[in-house]
A protein has these predicted regions:
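A contiguous active-site-proximal alpha/beta segment in oxidoreductase catalytic domains
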Residues: 98-136
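Hydrophobic residues in well-ordered beta-strands that form the structural core
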Residues: 15, 55, 92, 117-119
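Short beta->alpha connector loops
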Residues: 12-14, 72-75, 123-125
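Beta-loop-alpha module in the N-terminal Rossmann-like domain of NAD(P)-dependent dehydrogenases
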Residues: 49-91, 95-107
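N-terminal Rossmann-like dinucleotide-binding module
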Residues: 1-49
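Alpha-helical structural signal in soluble globular domains
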Residues: 22-26, 45-48, 82-86, 105-113, ...
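Short, well-ordered coil/turn segments that N-cap beta-strands
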Residues: 29, 65, 88, 115-116
Length: 136
C-alpha cells in the first residue's frame, strides 16, 4: 500500500511543539516537506527536523495528498483555497477562517472537489481540558 504523502504549511510554535515531532517520526506516511513565507526561519526548522523546505506553496502541494496548515489565521482562507484548488486534502488548526462566509466557501469548495477539510483543536485531549470536561 502506498504511503500517504503529506506536507506542512506554517512552521511556528504550534507546528514545532505539537505536530512536527510526531509527523517526522511516524512510518505510516511520508512527510514530503514544508512551506513557510518566512524562508530564513523555515530553513532552521526544516534543518532541525530534516525535512525539505519548499519555496512555493504550489510546489509542495503538487507532491502531496494532504497538507497540514499551521499558518496565521489571517492566511487560512487563501492558503486553504489554493490547496483545495490543487486537489489536496487539508487539515487546519482552529479556526477555519476569521469569517463565517469564508468558512462556508471553503466547505463548499471541499465538497465540490471531493476533498477532506478537517479543523483540529490540538488540545482537545490535554489533561486540563479532559478534567474540565469531567467536571462539567
Amino acid at each position: 500500500m502506498r504511503k500517504l504523502k503529506i506536507g506542512v504549511v506554517g512552521l511556528g510554535s504550534i507546528a514545532q511543539k505539537a505536530y512536527l515531532p510526531i509527523l517526522t517520526k511516524e512510518d505510516n506516511w511520508e512527510l514530503i516537506g514544508a512551506f513557510s513565507p518566512n524562508q530564513s526561519k523555515a530553513r532552521l526548522v526544516c534543518d532541525r527536523y530534516r525535512i525539505e523546505l519548499f519555496s512555493r506553496l504550489d510546489s509542495l502541494a503538487q507532491q502531496c495528498d494532504a497538507v497540514f496548515v499551521h499558518s496565521a489565521t489571517a492566511s487560512h482562507y487563501e492558503v486553504i483555497k489554493r490547496l483545495l484548488d490543487l486537489n489536496v486534502h487539508v487539515y487546519v488548526d482552529k479556526p477555519l477562517t476569521e469569517q463565517i462566509e469564508q468558512s462556508e466557501q471553503l466547505i463548499e469548495l471541499a465538497d465540490l472537489r471531493q476533498k477532506g477539510l478537517m479543523v483540529g483543536f490540538n488540545r482537545r485531549f490535554s489533561p486540563f481540558y479532559m478534567a474540565l470536561k469531567y467536571d462539567l
